[in-house]
């Protein structure tokens, strides 16, 4: 579903969907780790865009060393009581739900003491503070939890398995961050512009040196798309590990985007910075 959505949105040159974190990252994780009740409750509404998710991972003192997070969850009378703070939370102000890493086993090692909990964003005790940048936009937020109470069954996996669940999320995130469909869409946009723009009376697409470089990049983009389909096949076949493939896609996809943007600037100058 995620691949088809991404592909169709790119074909139609649609803007990115706000629900990407839920569709691309959480849904496949719930299919792997979630209970039947969690799958029934969240997957369909997420795929339909009715439930928007944000990710509660980073904290002021837990960024690159995420396992040192201190947001605390205590199980009291069958409910998780959560206190702490998250930061750099994308789209928190628009989300209905958060998938959150919480320290529930304070006596365990830092990786073994973390649990993965689903939190409704309208729960009393949650405060969202937008982080406004120099353009006066707020893509990120701080989120504070003050005795936030959620049902015990909102935990995904078992107590203390949150780090393993989060690694599953990360594997799906790597693949979506370097979506080859987006890169292919940008390549096609560049090709169309090169057919329209001219230099000394010649279309840019007709300049042999430009066309050769374009074909080289096009071959790499199509190869990346084929690799993405291989990852998709692995995801839907039980027992196949997509972690390494996701890492490869993230690395190669990022390098390929840099190469494509550099090509656009080399060929079109300032216009190449705006062609998206």
Where are these regions (language model features)?
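Single conserved hydrophobic/aromatic residue that forms the stacking wall/gate
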Residues: 1-11
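N-terminal glycine-rich flavin-associated loop
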Residues: 15-37, 63
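A short, Trp-centered hydrophobic/proline-enriched beta-strand micro-motif
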Residues: 49-57
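Glycine-rich phosphate/pyrophosphate-binding beta-alpha loops
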Residues: 62, 87-92, 134-135
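A structural signal for short hydrophobic beta-strand segments in well-ordered beta-sheet cores
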Residues: 71-74
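A short core secondary-structure module
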Residues: 79, 83-129
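Glycine-rich beta->alpha junctions and the first turn(s) of the following alpha-helix
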Residues: 126-226
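C-terminal helix-coil-helix/basic helical segment that borders enzyme active sites and/or dimer interfaces
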Residues: 199, 205-208, 222-276
């Amino acid at each position: 579903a995620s691949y088809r959505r991404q592909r169709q949105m790119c074909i139609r040159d649609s803007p990115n969907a706000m629900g990407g974190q839920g569709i691309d990252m959480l849904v496949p994780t719930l299919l792997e780790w979630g209970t039947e009740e969690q799958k029934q409750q969240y997957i369909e509404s997420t795929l339909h865009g009715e439930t928007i998710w944000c990710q509660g991972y980073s904290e002021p003192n837990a960024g690159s060393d995420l396992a040192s997070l201190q947001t605390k969850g205590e199980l009291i009378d069958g409910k998780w009581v959560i206190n702490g703070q998250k930061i750099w939370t994308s789209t928190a102000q628009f989300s209905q739900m958060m998938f959150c890493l919480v320290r529930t086993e304070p006596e365990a090692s830092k990786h073994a003491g973390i649990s993965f909990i689903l939190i409704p964003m309208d729960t009393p005790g949650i405060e969202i503070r937008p982080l406004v940048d120099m353009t006066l936009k707020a893509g990120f937020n701080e989120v504070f939890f003050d005795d936030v109470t959620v049902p015990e069954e909102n935990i995904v996996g078992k107590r203390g398995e949150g780090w393993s669940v989060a690694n599953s999320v990360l594997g799906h995130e790597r693949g979506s961050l370097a979506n080859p469909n987006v890169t292919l869409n940008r390549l096609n946009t560049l090709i169309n512009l090169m057919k329209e723009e001219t230099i000394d009376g010649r279309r840019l697409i007709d300049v042999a040196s430009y066309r050769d470089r374009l074909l080289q990049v096009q071959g790499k983009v199509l190869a990346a798309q084929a690799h993405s389909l291989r990852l998709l096949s692995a995801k839907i076949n039980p027992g196949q590990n997509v972690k390494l493939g996701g890492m490869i896609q993230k690395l190669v996809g990022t390098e390929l985007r840099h190469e494509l943007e550099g090509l656009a600037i080399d060929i079109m100058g300032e216009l190449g910075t705006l062609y998206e």
